[in-house]
Amino acid sequence: MNLEFSFGNLIAKNTENSTKEEGTWEVNKLMKFSSEEGRSSSDDYMFSSPDFEKAGNGDAEMREFFNFDGLPDQGLNLPSIAPPSLSHASSPNLSNSQDEAECLPSDRQQDYINPSLHLNRTVFPTPQHSISDANFLANTVDQPLGDNPMFGESDVYLLKMDPMKQAPYEAGFNSVKSSGAIEDPLQFRQPITMLETPFNESINTLTPYAEDYAFSSLNTSAPPLSNKEYAFSVNHLPAINEHKWKSRVETNMLFELRIKSNDNQSVPFEYLRLPSWAHREDKKRSSKPQPLQPDPETVIHLVPTVLAGDKSSVVKTCCTRCLLRERKRNARSQATKDACMPNYTKLKAYERNMTDASPEEKQQFRIKLLNQFPKLEDIDEDRMIMVFTGPEYVRLQLDGNERVAHINARITCYSSHQSCPYFHIIWDLYSMSRLVDRLVFPEPVTVLDDHKSRNLTKSEKTGKSNSQQAPSNHVLSKSNTVPNLVTGFPTRSDNPPNEKRRRTSSSENSRALDIQLSASDSHSPNSKSTLKSVEGSAFSMSKSPSVLSMTTPSGVSPSISKNGFHVVRVPSDAAGFQQRQQQEEGVLEAHTNESAPIAPFPYCTDDFSFSVEEKSSVNNLLTQFDEVAKPDFVSTPIKENVDSSFINMTPPDVSHAPLISRIIPNKGSIMGGYEVTILGANFFNGLVCLFGDNPAAVTFSWSESTIIATCPPATNAGTVPVTFQNYNSSSEAPVMFTYEDNLDNELYKLTVQVLGLKLTGSIQNPLTLSKKLLSSWRDDFAQYITNSIKQPPNSESKGQSKKTLLHDSNMESLKSVISRIVKKDSNQSDDSVESTILAAFALVTDTTTPYLSDFSLVNESGRSLLHLTAACGLSNASTFLCNAGCDVNKRDALGYTPLHYASLYDHKDICVNLLSNGAKPDVIGASGKKPIDLSSSEPIKLVFKEANNEQAQSISRSLIKDSEGSINTNETLESTSIVNEIEESAVQTKSYSESMWNKTVTMFPSLQELPQNYMSEVPSMMQKAMLSTLKSISAIPDDVPPPYSEFADDTTAQAGSSKRDSAISEDPDHHKSVWWSLRWQSRLVGRGKSTALTPEETRAIQEQAKTLKKAGMDFMLFSFWLPALLLLSIFGLRSYAQMIGGYLYRCIIGI
């Protein structure tokens, strides 16, 4: 996009003599400032005119969205910004960054340009001039000079400015200085703003930054460059899959700079020199040699400036996080990685735990991470906000009378890191130290990290670029667009045309429509409207005096069928509309009888809306849309002359039928009970999913396109169609689900888990546990075979003494397993699966471990071993589990008991066995079926009938009958009432005893502590005491090892042997090594437990002993002493009463 456009469409400003407003960028309503949406120069921005900006700045909405802090008042006339400072004391980011909350040290703080410095010094061009108009650029206005106390340290600020840019300003003040207005240039306290520097002035002094431009000498006496001779323009050329005016920090943007002569003469400039502080050589260097010292008069020097989105400050360099990324990218050599990455990885791992650290601590830690990598050598880190790639001197190629240069550049920091939605770019062009032109980019550049976003699809990205290349003809390819089955509107698919997509067997994928959206020009020359986006049923349309019609751009009627349909714009007048309507009537009639449903696209007027008055005429059309997906229509009356016959057309009922496109997973076990996900369209709650003829246990509609169903069990393995109850499948190839018979695998997995629970005490992965058991048993069995071959018969006890009790039990169990399998394999009539399962069950019961056997363990579907053995038809295994105490009425995820599966798979003997062990035949599962309802075998139904009869007979036996055999209701009720009274009296007795105990405990609190303390503490203390007694074991000296150990030799063994040893060795039943082994092992146990009691444990035992002693004393007090005292008191009182009575009697008699 060229910069040669009128400034009246860009900016306007108030001056001292005339009133002008400053134009601002106005964000379109379709614009999204996030990583999920791209930005287009033609679609997403429009530059507002001054008439719309009288109330305030147009960036108010954007500032409110990004929550800017410390911005100037929008009511003020914000000036432009002076060129940025090129000093080295700059910061990597703005200090008010919201994304990082960075608090930088003083040596890396951002130098801001105070917006107040530019008040009353703003000069903007008038609308009739363009940026390439050198005559306008040469016209300047003298600015008021003098001290201003509100600006503070403006002298220091001027000193920090780049002399390359400061020199032209000083040259512009020579006339003022000569008149005596100002004697010292440093007293000027207001920096020069943009677009007001005279371009025809030369620099009179040599700048300190001359080495950056490699000037051998500056020709200060050169004549000034005339601004009317050349015109400069810049254009951003978007690359493939790249949005214009939107980029990433890793992606180079391609810019095209053009220089042309206004008088059609040749341009003398041959090279464009990029800034040396922000330039990096390309990896693939050109083979052509670059000139070392070109003619300075043929070189144009480029100085970039990047402003924040609100134009309140200059962004000089990137933030700390982005600088760390640049350093990491630069440190790609192996030596640098080996030196830097180990420490960086450790610090990065530590940073993840700094969740509660303050922002200052986090920032200091980021700087520490940054210092792990070396600094950039070819780029100045203090001025690297915009980095250029390529040769330092870019050749200006001839293109007729113009010179063209292509420049690759990128912005190294994200917009959000600088607390702004976008950046403004300004390029200053110098020739022979004179400012030739200043190019202000027409639109801001947004730097987003959208390549990590999962919401923005590739098709949306390519759709944006396609809309830019052909804004008047938006075309959606066949492979990239599919219809929305709910609303009838075309929607973009998630995959681009060239991307591999996973195909399904659904019908709608095989009937993908070719949808082409094209836009024709409107009658108004200034009216330009494009279809922004069509996403699902929610869409939006820009304002345009046109309507939508279903026709082709060439006027040929469309084919509204499975082949696709086309949508273009037609005039909104009634005559043009009726003419096109007549062309379409014949086509609509011709396609009425076709099998594919018609998905009508609504006609609408200018604002793509319907009025309230005409709402009744479009009720049939609006019924196609779900209420959640309805767009918000704006009330606009429809023209009366428009024929609404097509609008009132009612779609067929088949369009509302639920459609299934895919099922995940599409296969599973015949036992069912697991959840599957069904994808499609038009789903709602209340649907019943059918797997063949069996309804799903649970069908829950998660959304209009997703259903979660619980797969029902099946009698046989195979493929069944998946449909909905009361809805016929409209597709030729319905979605299929495959049942697999993998009951053996499920049974093996659960059996291995039960075995692992017995051996290890924890539930583990069956595959991992089986590998461990096989490896352990293989090694143990090989060792057992080796020992049995090598050892003589009389040394068997010696070999066994090396094994522990658990090891011996495992060996015995392994031998029993081997013997069982061998015996079962010898009989060909037995089932190998059942024999293996029974051998595993025997291994669980025979193995001696500290852990208990648990045959009631369940898998993820809630099924136990009894469920699986009943389904597999293993009658002996089922009998074993019933005898082992498994719950015969255990329910799984479907609510089925083992009796359900035995009835489903027609295993009569297992049904009889379960019923005899207390299985209930009337249990109802999740599908509302009893075990008898699942069976198709008449013998099994007879078994259930007999069981029901026996249950009825057992119930009838409990009823009291009279002599005639009829039920005596009165006596039965009386017996029942007696039983109830007995139960109630038992409950009352229990509650009374509990209340008495509570009262006793309240009176004597020590009685409550006695049972609890004694029962909980005595066993542990007894164990401690038993372990402590092992310290007193001293069967043999510590320095005498057993004779078979590696520490013993013949002399030690002979010296350590005693008379008792020789006596035992003569006995053939007691081997010498066995006796030594027992003595040594006992001694080892004593040594190992010599420190069993720690001081803390000793103190705890003493405290518990005191508690027990006190509880015992209290018990003796309350159980013996208090009753004895009570009896003595009674006898004493009785004796005292008798004595008093006798005394009184004698007194009375004596009187």
Curated annotation (Swiss-Prot):
Transmembrane spans: 1113-1133
Key words, A-Z: ANK repeat, Membrane, Repeat, Transmembrane, Transmembrane helix, Vacuole
Protein's membrane topology: Single-pass membrane protein
Residue ranges of the region described as Disordered: 77-104, 452-511, 516-535, 1041-1067
Each ANK repeat, start to end: 861-890, 894-923
Polar residues: compositionally biased ranges: 87-98, 464-496, 517-532
One GO term (biological process): positive regulation of lipid metabolic process
InterPro entries: Ankyrin_rpt, Ankyrin_rpt-contain_sf, Ig-like_fold, Ig_E-set, IPT_dom
GO cellular component term of the entry, any: nucleus
Localisation: Vacuole membrane
UniProt feature, compositional bias: Basic and acidic residues: 452-463, 1058-1067
A Pfam family annotated for this UniProt entry: TIG
Source superkingdom: Eukaryota
Gene Ontology molecular function, alphabetical: double-stranded DNA binding; transcription coactivator activity; transcription coregulator activity
IPT/TIG domain location: 658-739
Family matches, as CDD domains: IPT
Protein name, as recorded: Ankyrin and IPT/TIG repeat-containing protein C26H5.05
